[in-house]
């Protein structure tokens, strides 16, 4: 009898200590910071001063999120946590959840959707990873400030293998909502291996006012290995003030892709622009930023802003692929996934 009790105790300890799973848990891409690149990684500023890379909730408690209330409870604060969606989360109306710091929010392979859930920063929090998520929202939530991922403070954010699925739209309609806003003092961000689709407006990057020059230099941002499909404008984005490294992305079915606005420093490399490029809308250049492109397809013209002297190679090391490879890769691997994540570089 004693031997049986001892065996049961040892077996119970084995269950408690077994890594990566818990009772009732779900499979998820527990990849830590594998695949992290660009400004959210180990990068330097313009003075050559290095910063640490984004770690999110690394080494923190794994918490399985089953409800919107769970998400509100655990996404705030500064305690490191890895938050795994065990259920798809949905709200009937716009529901805002505040982002804290030192968090990884990751969708499981089976359940990964946030519908009408709007994530926003507060104060100077940061060091957050968003991975393997699908953002959806109702078409009637379409005001100017209706943006599902809103980052305006803190540093070190990594948005990876995330899908913003959008919805049908009328290009001449009154929709003003966007998919993503990153600006004000938010800094050192990478968007990678993600998909943005089916929306009138895509991404707005940098403080959205041409007279607020105190935000010059924000954000430092890498946009790499992403797929922009059927965004009428702003995919990859409308860019102001910051440093934007835009490499190996595929934009298709667009009216305007890159909008160059006030004091944006944009270094574009080896992107592929598909249907829509024949209309001449790859560059929407206001003439007030700085821009350079190398190797994109087709060749970019209609540039009126001066060439940027900035090169992201002074901030971090990186590699590039051809535009043709990029198109094939992101079509297959960008966005949230139901199996293993594949990372571009």
Curated annotation (Swiss-Prot):
Residues 1-24 form the signal peptide. It catalyses: Eliminative cleavage of (1->4)-alpha-D-galacturonan methyl ester to give oligosaccharides with 4-deoxy-6-O-methyl-alpha-D-galact-4-enuronosyl groups at their non-reducing ends. The active site is at residue 234. GO terms for molecular function: pectate lyase activity; pectin lyase activity. It is found in: Secreted. One of its GO terms (cellular component) is extracellular region. It is an enzyme of class 4 (lyase). Its EC number is 4.2.2.10. InterPro entries: Pec_lyase (IPR002022), Pectin_lyas_fold (IPR012334), Pectin_lyase_fold/virulence (IPR011050), PEL (IPR045032). Pfam families: Pectate_lyase_4 (PF00544). Keywords: Lyase, Secreted, Signal. Belongs to the polysaccharide lyase 1 family. Catalyzes the depolymerization of pectins of methyl esterification degree from 13 to 75%, with an endo mode of action. Cannot degrade polygalacturonate. This is Pectin lyase. It comes from Bacillus subtilis (strain 168). The lineage of its organism: Bacteria, Bacillati, Bacillota, Bacilli, Bacillales.
């Amino acid at each position: 009898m004693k031997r049986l009790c001892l065996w049961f105790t040892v077996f119970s300890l084995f269950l408690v200590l077994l890594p990566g799973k818990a009772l009732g848990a779900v499979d998820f891409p527990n990849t830590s910071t594998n695949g992290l690149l660009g400004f959210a990684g180990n990068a330097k500023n313009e003075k050559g001063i290095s910063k640490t890379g984004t770690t999110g909730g690394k080494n923190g408690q794994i918490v399985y999120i089953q409800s919107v209330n769970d998400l509100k409870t655990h996404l705030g604060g500064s305690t490191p946590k890895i938050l795994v969606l065990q259920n798809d989360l949905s709200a009937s109306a716009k529901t805002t959840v505040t982002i804290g710091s030192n968090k990884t929010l990751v969708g499981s392979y089976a359940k990964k959707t946030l519908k009408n859930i709007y994530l926003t920063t507060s104060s100077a929090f940061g060091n957050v990873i968003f991975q393997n998520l699908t953002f959806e929202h109702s078409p009637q939530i379409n005001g100017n400030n209706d943006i599902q991922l809103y980052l305006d403070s803190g540093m070190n954010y990594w948005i990876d293998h995330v899908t913003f699925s959008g919805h049908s739209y009328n290009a001449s309609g009154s929709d003003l909502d966007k998919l993503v806003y990153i600006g004000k003092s938010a800094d050192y961000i990478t968007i990678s291996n993600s998909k943005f689709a089916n929306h009138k407006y895509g991404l707005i990057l940098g403080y959205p006012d041409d007279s607020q020059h105190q935000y010059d230099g924000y954000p430092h941002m890498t946009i790499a290995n992403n797929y922009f499909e059927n965004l009428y404008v702003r995919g990859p984005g409308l860019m102001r003030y910051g440093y934007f490294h835009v490499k190996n992305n595929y934009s298709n079915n667009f009216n305007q892709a890159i909008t160059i606005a006030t004091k944006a420093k944009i270094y574009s490399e080896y992107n592929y622009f598909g249907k829509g490029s024949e209309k001449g809308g790859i560059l929407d250049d206001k003439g007030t930023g700085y821009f350079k492109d190398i190797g994109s397809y087709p060749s970019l013209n209609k540039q009126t802003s001066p060439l940027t002297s900035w090169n992201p190679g002074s901030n971090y090391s990186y590699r590039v692929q051809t535009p043709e490879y990029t198109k094939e890769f992101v079509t297959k691997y960008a966005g949230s996934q139901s199996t293993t994540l594949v990372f571009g570089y």
